């Protein structure tokens, strides 16, 4: 670097420190990108720019990375630590060649790799983005282009507070040298590949160019499918084509988003303030996987679970904060009220009616609009459950949007389409008390401005929030495996609905929901709620609660549920203290210490938070309950019993293990419970360690209400094998309600009809019932007996008595 360059850069540092407030993506590149600090590092930037290199320098030093302006010493040679892939524009010329100095650095590095087989230089592509505003659709400029001095000065002044420094995955020059050689042409090839990479970086951060709304409507009106639907509408209603077209325009206006970058930018600041006011921190996991998908050009469809209206805002905020484009969000038409509707619409929401069966014009327009979003490359988000979960459990998926996504693919899309499951968790859901009232029969209050104002007035500290991105599902690959000839059904009109569609969509929906649950976030409140609700009086001493949380943490860490779920790093003591700070527990003291308990009202509300993570403990809890109630079993008997019950748990709780994995998972859980001193194994027999039985009993009770529900249905069926499906569901629900009242079961889902309906689908799948509803009596009686054996005597007696009274 010349002395003139050094001097000019020194002069720039002060104004840049005042004008530029940039963000690093990812926030911890050393960990997220697996950068090895013991190996040499070189930075690659898209354009020659002193402003960019100084901005990069600031972040590199803050993040513990080498200074890009320091020299790189390798085997006695001193090299520049950065390269520019393109020259900078000037006022007089628009140069776009690769600077010779960069080619020299690449060539020198490759030759050093040829001489030293141990050398591995890491190239870190880094892009400094000044503003993230997407362009207009008719703009033919490239996504990423060099700026001359005046343009860069303007960018610093106008977008200095909206600057991103994006670090990309490391490129190993050792790998390049081994795979492609070390001659001089490889240096030019590296530069060409880097240009494409940097352009994709910009596209991933800003998104595709945006059309004007009217231009979008005009394009949709020209689609053959909508023209045909308008003609059919005019004919069926006996109105003119013009009137039917006006109706179509009104529907488009009702549906379509009106994305505004300025609102997103301002909204990010407002939401940042809101999250800081509401929550004690947002924990985000696995965002790097999604960034890579966006950068690789995937059409991304986000499918989050739906806990709260906050979900709409939270996911968009997190994606923007992580350097990605907020998606277009399918929102219920009930949210299209003033002033929320226009704000949501500018934030990317497009609105969907709850039902449009039989309305061909509406369904055609909605399908075409969704296909247009996919075709233009906008990421999309929809809540696969169809509505917010009132119980805290994941609901069975509504498959309509998923089917329309597949239909959009059948138009012949060029880019891969990928579903990204998202688990959203809270230590406080602001609607949870309302959910409890609705489950007790209160009518749902319609969303309106006054409801929003009342909610805002209640804003207070809600603990922590969690956004975990689950394992992506690449739809092209999924269809190749489950409908190998799907490409033969490609139809540009988008009307194709092949025979394989329904079964494939249903299986895909289950896989999607399973991946959401796989990414669950455990936290202080969900763990404490699980423990307290498992105690008979909803109360534990502080020592017992801490001990139980330690049991849960050890299980989750030593027998991990999945690759994408998260466990708190805090100690059990700290988790209990944090949960107490949320003011949801009663704390009383006596001479022996603190007792932490739940009152009746909070007991009902806490079931919501327990249900968020109940699937993580389903198998450990089942094994614990089995050994407690049967006082000792062989390992083979435990394996056999778990195999019988597992299909029902898997269907209801979207458990991730396949049946062929069960044996090893059960063995690992038993080993862990032995390691924790709760079980003893001798001569293949598993027994309880009586000196440490409380933790095992609390663990077992987590699943006991689920087993009670199964026991009601199976024993009712065993006693009355001729009952049809609707009678069986109704009688099971009635008995569950009675059992709940008699034994103080507060869980709202305990007698939920939907849960029973799901169970009966599994009865058919497992051949307890045939397709005509006929019962395999011997098999049913055997299973009913197994379920009875895992219940406490007083509960079993109530069920037996209720079944006889129901006959």
From Swiss-Prot:
Gene Ontology molecular functions: glycerol-3-phosphate O-acyltransferase activity
Annotated metabolic or biological route of this protein: Phospholipid metabolism; CDP-diacylglycerol biosynthesis; CDP-diacylglycerol from sn-glycerol 3-phosphate: step 1/3
Compartments in which it is found: Cell inner membrane
EC annotation from Swiss-Prot or TrEMBL: 2.3.1.15
UniProt membrane topology term: Peripheral membrane protein
GO CC annotation: plasma membrane
Family matches, as CDD domains: LPLAT_DHAPAT-like
Record GO biological process: CDP-diacylglycerol biosynthetic process; fatty acid metabolic process
Motif HXXXXD motif per record, residues: 305-310
Keywords: Acyltransferase, Cell inner membrane, Cell membrane, Lipid biosynthesis, Lipid metabolism, Membrane, Phospholipid biosynthesis, Phospholipid metabolism, Transferase
Catalyzed reactions: sn-glycerol 3-phosphate + an acyl-CoA = a 1-acyl-sn-glycero-3-phosphate + CoA
Keyword Zinc-finger listed: no
Superkingdom classification of source: Bacteria
UniProt xrefs under NCBIfam families: plsB, PRK04974.1
Family: Belongs to the GPAT/DAPAT family.
Domain note: The HXXXXD motif is essential for acyltransferase activity and may constitute the binding site for the phosphate moiety of the glycerol-3-phosphate.
Identification of the protein by name: Glycerol-3-phosphate acyltransferase
GN (gene name): plsB
């Amino acid at each position: 670097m010349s002395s003139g360059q050094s001097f000019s850069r020194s002069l720039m540092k002060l104004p840049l420190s005042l004008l530029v407030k940039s963000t690093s993506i990812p926030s911890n590149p050393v960990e997220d990108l697996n950068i090895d600090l013991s190996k040499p590092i070189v930075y690659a930037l898209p354009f020659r720019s002193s402003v960019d290199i100084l901005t990069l320098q600031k972040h590199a030093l803050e993040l513990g990375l080498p200074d890009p302006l320091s020299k790189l010493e390798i085997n006695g040679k001193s090299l520049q630590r950065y390269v520019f892939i393109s020259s900078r524009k000037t006022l007089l010329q628009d140069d776009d060649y690769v600077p010779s100095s960069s080619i020299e650095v690449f060539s020198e590095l490759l030759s050093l790799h040829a001489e030293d087989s141990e050398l591995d230089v890491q190239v870190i592509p880094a892009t400094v983005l000044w503003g993230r505003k997407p362009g207009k659709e008719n703009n033919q400029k490239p996504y990423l282009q060099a700026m001359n001095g005046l343009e860069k000065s303007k960018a610093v002044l106008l977008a200095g507070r909206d600057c991103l420094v994006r670090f990309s995955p490391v490129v190993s020059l050792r790998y390049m040298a081994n795979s492609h050689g070390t001659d001089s042409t490889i240096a030019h090839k590296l530069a060409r590949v880097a240009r494409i990479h940097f352009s994709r970086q910009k596209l991933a951060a800003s998104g595709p160019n945006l059309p004007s709304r009217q231009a979008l409507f005009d394009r949709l009106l020209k689609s053959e499918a909508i023209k045909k639907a308008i003609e059919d509408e005019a004919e069926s209603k006996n109105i003119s084509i013009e009137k039917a077209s006006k109706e179509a325009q009104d529907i488009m206006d009702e549906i379509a988003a009106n994305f505004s970058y300025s609102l997103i930018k301002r909204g990010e600041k407002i939401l940042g303030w809101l999250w800081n006011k509401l929550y004690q921190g947002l924990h985000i996991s696995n965002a790097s996987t999604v960034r890579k998908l966006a950068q690789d050009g995937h059409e991304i469809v986000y499918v989050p679970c739906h806990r709260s209206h906050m979900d709409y805002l939270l996911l968009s905020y997190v994606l923007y904060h992580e350097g990605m484009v907020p998606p277009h969000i399918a929102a219920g038409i009930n949210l299209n009220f003033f002033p929320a509707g226009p704000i949501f619409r500018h934030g990317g929401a497009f609105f969907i009616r709850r039902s449009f069966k039989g309305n061909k014009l509406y369904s055609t327009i909605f399908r075409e609009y969704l296909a247009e979003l996919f075709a233009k490359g906008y990421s999309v988000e929809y809540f696969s459950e169809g509505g917010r979960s009132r119980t805290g459990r994941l609901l069975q998926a509504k498959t309509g949007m998923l089917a329309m996504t597949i239909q959009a693919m059948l138009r012949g899309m060029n880019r891969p389409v990928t579903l990204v499951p998202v688990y959203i968790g809270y230590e406080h859901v602001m609607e949870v008390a309302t959910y409890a009232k609705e489950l007790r029969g209160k009518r749902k209050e319609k969303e309106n401005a006054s409801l929003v104002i009342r909610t805002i007035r209640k804003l207070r500290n809600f603990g922590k929030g969690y956004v975990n991105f689950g394992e992506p599902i690449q739809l092209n690959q999924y269809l190749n495996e489950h409908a190998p000839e799907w490409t033969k059904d490609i139809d540009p009109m988008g009307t194709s609905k092949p025979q394989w569609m329904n079964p494939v969509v249903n299986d895909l929906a289950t896989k999607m929901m399973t991946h959401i649950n796989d990414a669950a976030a455990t936290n202080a409140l969900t763990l404490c709620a699980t423990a307290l609700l498992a105690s008979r009086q909803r109360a534990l001493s502080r020592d017992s609660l801490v001990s139980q949380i330690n049991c849960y943490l050890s299980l989750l860490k030593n027998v991990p549920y999945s690759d994408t779920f998260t466990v708190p790093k805090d100690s059990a003591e700290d988790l209990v203290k944090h949960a107490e700070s949320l003011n949801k527990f009663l704390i009383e003291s006596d001479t022996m210490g603190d007792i932490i308990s739940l009152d009746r009202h909070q007991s009902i509300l806490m079931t919501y938070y327990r249900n968020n993570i109940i699937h993580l403990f389903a198998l450990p809890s089942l094994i614990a309950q089995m050994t407690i109630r049967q006082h000792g079993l062989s390992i083979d008997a435990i394996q056999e019993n778990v195999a019988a019950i597992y299909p029902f748990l898997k269907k209801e709780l979207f458990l991730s293990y396949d049946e062929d994995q069960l044996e090893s998972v059960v063995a690992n859980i038993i080993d862990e419970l032995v390691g924790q001193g709760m079980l003893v194994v001798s001569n293949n027999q598993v027994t309880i360690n009586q000196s440490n039985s409380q933790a095992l009993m609390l663990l077992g009770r987590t699943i006991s209400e689920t087993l009670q529900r199964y026991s009601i249905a199976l024993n009712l069926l065993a006693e009355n094998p001729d009952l049809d499906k609707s009678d069986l569901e109704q009688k099971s629900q009635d008995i569950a309600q009675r059992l709940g009242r008699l034994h103080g079961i507060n869980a709202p889902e305990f007698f939920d009809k939907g849960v029973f309906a799901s169970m009966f689908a599994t009865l058919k799948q497992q051949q307890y019932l045939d397709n005509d509803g006929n019962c395999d009596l011997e098999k049913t009686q055997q299973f009913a007996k197994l379920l009875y054996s895992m219940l406490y005597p007083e509960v079993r007696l109530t069920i037996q008595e209720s079944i006889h009274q129901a006959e």
